[in-house]
Amino acid sequence: MKKTLLIILFLIVSLGSFAQLGEFVVIGNNTGFKASTKANAKAIFRGKYSSWKNGESVTIVLPSTKSDNVVSVASQVYGLTVKGMQKYWLEQVFQGRSNAPVFFETDEEIINYVKRNPGAVGIVRASRSVPQSLVIQITE
C-alpha cells in the first residue's frame, strides 16, 4: 500500500512539473513558442537570447529583491544567491551581453507586464492564476 501511494505521489509531482520550472511557471507573450526544455528555459532567463525566432526582442521579467520568492528564483533558475543573481545581471548588462531584466515585486505585476509587452518572458509561482495563453510548457 505504501509503495502504491509513493508511486502515485511521484506521478502527481512529475506531471505537475511538466509545465513548471520547479515551483514556478514560465510565462511569455509573443515569444514564438509554447514549449521549451528546462535547459533552454534557464538559458533564456540567463540572457542567452536577445530576440525570439519571430523577431520580437526578448524582455526578461523577474521578481525584485523585495519579492518574497526572489530567493527561490535565484536558487532554482540561476543556481545562485540573490546577491549572486544581481551580480550576474550587472556583469551581463555592463559587458553588453544582455539588456537588463525588468523587476517587479509581485507575481501579479509580472503577469500584467508580460501580458502587455510582446516578447516579454517571466517567471511566477505555480500557485498563481495565469492565463493559459501565456504559459510556456517546460519539459525535461
Located regions from the model:
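Sec-dependent N-terminal signal peptides
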Residues: 4-16
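Flexible loop/hinge segments at secondary-structure junctions
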Residues: 20-140
